[in-house]
């Protein structure tokens, strides 16, 4: 398993998390690199490239380490409901995992296969890649059930404030992936200002 980055600036948080766990991340930033990745994976058995932002770092390389979430089953369900919302042209899947306490509270990732297909379509690939270009973005929102912020958020008595804070956490994660644009970005900015009042 080889971790790589296509944009070290945009993917810096994911790179830092991987390096913090002792992994190395290679830079593959050009269009030639995308073809190289596919070619190597087809020709060399057992070699797999995974973009550093394809999943939370604890899931990228399976080391059979399971960290349990400190949230109860009811709190997990409550957290999932707080993060269920719609964004145009985006399919969002929400999951709660027990990650490191110092990991981000919410992490947005895009599945490796769909991201690759969309990347190839954006480079002018025909056939099935054109089909994938028309599909909505898929985003996994991983809620870090061990982050201290959720102990306070789930106990917040003001429901409106609780929902705004949850949405801001999700929007920060989406923003880190460059997936917050247009009206959604404007709403995030306005909501952030409102929460600071």
Predicted regions and their residues:
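Long, intrinsically disordered, charge-dense linkers/tails
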Residues: 1-197
């Amino acid at each position: 398993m080889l971790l790589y980055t296509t944009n070290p600036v945009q993917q810096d948080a994911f790179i830092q998390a991987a390096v913090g766990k002792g992994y190395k991340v290679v830079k593959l930033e050009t269009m030639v690199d995308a073809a190289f990745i596919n070619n190597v994976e087809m020709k060399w058995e057992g070699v797999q490239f995974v973009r550093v932002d394809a999943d939370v770092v604890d899931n990228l390389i399976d080391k059979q380490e399971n960290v349990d979430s400190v949230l109860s089953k009811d709190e997990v369900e409550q957290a999932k409901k707080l993060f269920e919302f719609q964004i145009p042209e985006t399919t969002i899947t929400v999951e709660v995992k027990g990650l490191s306490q110092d990991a981000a509270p919410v992490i947005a990732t895009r599945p490796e296969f769909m991201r690759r297909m969309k990347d190839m379509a954006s480079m002018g690939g025909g056939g099935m890649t054109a089909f994938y270009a028309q599909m909505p973005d898929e985003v996994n929102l991983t809620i870090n059930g061990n982050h201290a912020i959720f102990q306070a958020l789930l106990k917040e008595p003001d429901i409106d404030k609780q929902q705004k804070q949850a949405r801001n956490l999700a929007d920060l994660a989406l923003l880190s992936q460059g997936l917050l644009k247009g009206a959604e970005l404007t709403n995030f900015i306005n909501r952030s200002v409102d929460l600071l009042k």
